[in-house]
Amino acid sequence: MLINLDFETRSKVDIKDKGLDAYAKDISTEVICMAYSIDGGEVKLWTPQFAIPQFLFNPEARFSAWNAAFEYNILRNVLEVPVRHDQFIDSMAMAAANNLPQSLDDCAQVLDAEFKKDPIGKRLIQKLSKPKKDGTFNKDPDLLDQMYEYCKQDVRVEMSIARQIRALSSNEQSVWVLTQKINESGVPVDPDELKNAVFLCENNKTAINREIVELTGGYTANQPAKLIEWLSSRNVIVDDLTAETVTKMLQRSNLTDEVKRVLELRQQGSMTSVAKYEKMLEVQVAGRIRNTLVYHGASTGRFASRGGLNLQNIARPSLGDAEIEEANERILVRGEGGTMEELSSLVRSAIKAPDGFTFIDADLSSIENRVASWIAGQNDKVELFRQGLDEYKAFASSALYNVPYEEVTKDMRQISKSAVLGCMFGQGAKGLVEYADGMGVKMTMGESEKAVKAYRHAYAKVKSAWYDFEGAAIAAIQNEGHPY
């Protein structure tokens, strides 16, 4: 039995702010309706005034939905139906694996599917799924009837897309299921430690703003336009006050003590990494942050991290290991004073195992680089991996800095890693600067041009493979049914 389904729900919790876990487990969350089709039949509707359909409890049933994690969580946590992850097929995951949009509306448009999403949905969700100012919900019968039809149409759209695109292979389906299990297990955090961090961040921001107001005559760290005017009055001309700009300005030797201090305060007060403490505290439920891992979230097929908190993009700490260990105990555990730099360096440390458990951080080492080299026949690089060498250090040593392998520093390796991973997919100099910036690495255009040239020389077979793959993809599309 295959059941295509879609839920419309209402809640006092904002799913975009709090995340799916908090949304599905909140006492205010209710089902408005469920549209469903059994084995491709007519799309029908269920509403909570009737008993929960027994077919949902069938352990042999399969469920298909767009973004199936939502339907799974509503079934498990709101309707208390004991479904399993391996019962689900996610048509959104299928679309992602076929390099199609992960928006139901956009995907249907791109495929010119038989059914299209009803644009009325956004208005209905605003009116029916979110509480009014008095905390109650709008239950207007006419609007609900429109919502019911909208929900049924979503199922028709999902079914029409699923019929048109290639299903996940059995192996990829098992990866998707494992992803859902990982998401349900979640990442452990200590709410009390997060509260300590948030409290100290707020204290620091207050102190920073108090000092910067005194220095500038009334401007805070979060008023860049006003600070630019103030700097201009001190004969310091800048176009913006981004983190990169401020860092470069602080390297100048001709700044007055007053200007230098204002820039330092702006740098501390605008640290975005510390905002993750607030988001962690907001989305965690009973010390767990769930549903942050996205199957096939990147166009290359790699995982992404979303759900209101990107756990794959936590800023690298500026402090050393010993400093972090001391600061962790003092700041997070005891809630005693800490600087913004220390707090920024402790974001990763906020994720930790409960007492009696060990938190193991594991990663596939240079997996994309290894596979790209192997597929392209870049055997000299494959041999480096066989010898257990670090290719990022090797590339930094031979191509970027001309220093012995053993003398490659942590910062050199990080720049080299950005260059290798960015250039692997054909990035030019401008694209590499942007790619590296996304990894938290600052590269000049000159450094980027040098890295691109060096990569394409060192990885000549990988470069050739780009055009081979492009030609094969075009030929496959033009000649359906033939492998290339």
Which residue ranges define each predicted feature?
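Conserved "right-hand" nucleotidyltransferase catalytic core of DNA-directed polymerases
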Residues: 1-13, 33-35, 99, 110, ...
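Active-site-proximal helix-loop-helix substrate-binding element of RNase H-like nuclease domains
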Residues: 25-49, 55-166, 389-400
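Short active-site loop/helix that positions an aromatic residue
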Residues: 69-81, 98, 228-235, 365-379, ...
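Alpha-helical scaffolds flanking conserved acidic
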Residues: 87-90, 172-177, 409-419
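Amphipathic, charged-and-aliphatic alpha-helical interface segments
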Residues: 202, 213, 408-426
